[in-house]
A protein has these predicted regions:
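Mid-bilayer segments of alpha-helical transmembrane spans in multi-pass integral membrane proteins
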Residues: 104-112
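Interfacial loop at the N-terminal end of multi-pass membrane proteins
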Residues: 17-22, 28-75, 122-137
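Core segments of transmembrane alpha-helices
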Residues: 70-83, 147-156
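Juxtamembrane boundary at the C-terminal end of a transmembrane helix
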Residues: 159-165
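Membrane-helix exit/interface motif
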Residues: 40-41, 73, 77-90, 113
Length: 165
């Protein structure tokens, strides 16, 4: 009953592949959307605040997002690996590889760019930040823009890969 000319097994593999692709697109889209909203929505609004409320808001955002972003990334990466392994070297394989590369760029920027700055930022006193706090924030924002576009381009490659399949 498990194998009727291979069609039941083949249908199950196809279903699992479709679910993996859906989950991968979903989580990659959530990651890209979250990055876009933070980068071009929240960040631009935060900068108009005075020093104390700006730093307090940044502290709150860092604390909230430091659990959410890794969870979204892990789900994106795991579903991507599943979809890629089930897809094999099909039509969208190269695009999935480019998407994975963009996701790796996102990770490198996060680990070596934004996380150290966020860690330092949490130590700032809102009423007495370091004298160069605005310079540090501009550096953080450059990393944030690069991260955002790495996530968005990764998502675009995944959409194209699914479209080719």
């Amino acid at each position: 009953m498990l194998l009727i000319n291979g069609s039941v097994l083949g249908a199950m593999v196809d279903l699992i592949h479709a679910i993996a692709e859906f989950l991968n697109l979903f989580f990659a889209g959530v990651l890209a959307g979250e990055e876009l909203v933070i980068c071009y929505g929240v960040r631009t609004v935060v900068t108009v605040l005075d020093q104390r409320p700006q730093i307090e808001l940044r502290h709150a955002l860092i604390r909230k997002l430091r659990a959410l972003e890794p969870a979204i990334f892990i789900l994106t990466a795991l579903s991507g690996l599943a979809a890629m392994s089930l897809d094999g070297t099909g039509a969208g394989f190269r695009l999935r590889c480019f998407a994975t590369l963009c996701l790796l760029i996102w990770v490198v920027i996060t680990l070596f760019g934004t996380i150290p700055i966020k860690k330092d930022t949490l130590a700032w006193r809102p009423d007495a930040p370091p004298t160069d706090w605005k310079v540090l924030l501009r550096r953080w924002e450059r990393f944030d823009i690069a991260r955002c576009w790495a996530a968005v381009i990764s998502f675009a490659f995944l959409v194209a890969a699914v479209g080719m399949g």
